[in-house]
């Protein structure tokens, strides 16, 4: 889950904890890029999906609450655009697995415009950099 968190303790979870470390100049969590994918969603987008489903009397059943799934090599490539000096994990040497695929037709029927992954990453990093829980 990307985007702002509600409580300071939430900063200890993924992805906020390791993004904060990268902001502070530490290494990312992987020594080698995982040959795997992860599904990503922004907190505000997920909340908007919940509200849209709740307010739609025709909505029923399950809806995917993620934007999409990206391979870790693509996530790290995007993070390198944000953090040009970040030490990159070792690249994968085998063929990359396909990211998890979804049929988003039900999700999209709710009419919620979701942030793409580059925007999600950038906004989350900017939010963490703002030191939201800094006490004076």
Briefly describe each language-model feature range:
Residues 1-17:
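Flexible, glycine-rich beta-alpha linker
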Residues 4-8, 74, 97-104:
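Short, solvent-exposed polar/charged micro-motifs at secondary-structure junctions
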Residues 14-35, 84-87, 92-97:
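Alpha-helical membrane-targeting segments
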Residues 20-63:
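Alpha-helical substrate-binding/gating segment
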Residues 47-96, 124, 128, 132-136:
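Mid/C-terminal beta-alpha module of Rossmann-like enzyme folds, strongest
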């Amino acid at each position: 889950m990307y985007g702002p968190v509600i409580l300071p303790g939430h900063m200890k979870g993924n992805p906020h904890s390791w993004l904060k470390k990268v902001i502070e100049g530490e290494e990312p969590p992987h020594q080698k890029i995982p040959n795997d994918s992860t599904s990503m969603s922004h907190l505000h987008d997920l909340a908007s999906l919940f509200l849209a489903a709740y307010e739609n009397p025709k909505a029923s059943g399950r809806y995917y609450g993620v934007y999409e799934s990206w391979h870790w090599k693509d996530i790290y490539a995007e993070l390198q655009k944000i953090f040009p000096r970040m030490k990159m994990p070792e690249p994968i040497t085998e063929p990359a697995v396909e990211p998890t695929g979804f049929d988003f037709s039900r999700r999209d029927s709710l009419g919620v415009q979701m942030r793409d992954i580059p925007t999600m990453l950038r906004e989350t990093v900017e939010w963490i950099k703002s030191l939201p829980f800094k006490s004076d």
